[in-house]
Amino acid sequence: MDEILVLVDKHDNPIGSAGKADIHQKGMLHRAFSIFVFDNKGNLLLQKRAATKYHSAGLWTNSCCGHPRVGEALEAAAHRRLGEEMGFDCPLKKVSSFIYHAILPNNLIEYEYDHVFIGRFDKEPIINLDEVSDYKWVNLLKLRALINNAPDVYTVWFKKIINGLSYQDIEEWQRLI
């Protein structure tokens, strides 16, 4: 069954709902979240999206991402997806929000009001192979070079977030968790 997601205006006020597939085919602005999980050494947990995902399949991205369902609190949805995709939960802190729009290679359209959460976890995840095909911990100082050397292997939203951060922003995130 197609998930029903929250449509929002440019101020993140709910204005309706629609099916996930319809939203991404028509490019409707909807609520989403991106989670960045760090270990105690400051490494970022990346996941490789499963090859069966209907968009951005097989691409590397942030620790977890998803959408709240209608009636579901944003942070509750973030915790739900972290467990569903990565097999663990941890305290999360919201650090920013932004709107982005991108046309994906398969003619799907991402138009999201994306809320960014950070967390800390120091064990290995137990990935759900229906969602995630691989994971790795990456040193943040090397991450931009990795993305610049092979931009096509990373999701659009992940590149947008990372490229929009200064090293001071990343250091601040580290202090917050």
UniProtKB/Swiss-Prot annotation:
GO terms for molecular function: isopentenyl-diphosphate delta-isomerase activity; metal ion binding. InterPro entries: Idi_bact, IsopentenylPP_isomerase_typ1, NUDIX_hydrolase-like_dom_sf, NUDIX_hydrolase_dom. Residues 28-160 form the Nudix hydrolase domain. One of its GO terms (cellular component) is cytoplasm. The active site is at 65, 112. One of its GO terms (biological process) is isopentenyl diphosphate biosynthetic process. Its cofactor is Mg(2+); Mn(2+). Homodimer. Catalyzes the 1,3-allylic rearrangement of the homoallylic substrate isopentenyl (IPP) to its highly electrophilic allylic isomer, dimethylallyl diphosphate (DMAPP). NCBIfam families: IPP_isom_1, PRK03759.1. This is Isopentenyl-diphosphate Delta-isomerase 2. The lineage of its organism: Bacteria, Pseudomonadati, Pseudomonadota, Gammaproteobacteria, Enterobacterales. The gene is idi2.
